[in-house]
Amino acid sequence: MTLATRYFAEQVLRKRPNLSLEICRVVIENPLRISPQEDGRIRYWGWATLQNEAEPRILRVITLEDGTTIHNAFPDRNFREDAP
C-alpha cells in the first residue's frame, strides 16, 4: 500500500489529474536518481508514462523522510541524466 500526505491527496492530484499514486510508486521503486533534501524529504526522479499521454516523461516524486509517503510529484522538464 502506498501512503500519501493530505497535501498530495487534496492538492497535487487535483491540480495534476494525470498523476496517480501508482505512477509515483513506480518512480520510487525504479529511480534514475535519488537525492535527500535539507528538510529530510527525499527526491526521486524516474521515467513515467502519465495518464492520457503516449510518451514517457521524467517525473520527480518527493516523499517524506520515511521514503514511502508521497508528498509531491510533478513532471521535471529540467532533469538531466548526466548531472550530479
Q: What are these regions, as identified by a protein language model?
A:
Residues 1-84:
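Ribonuclease/tRNase effector modules and their secretory precursors
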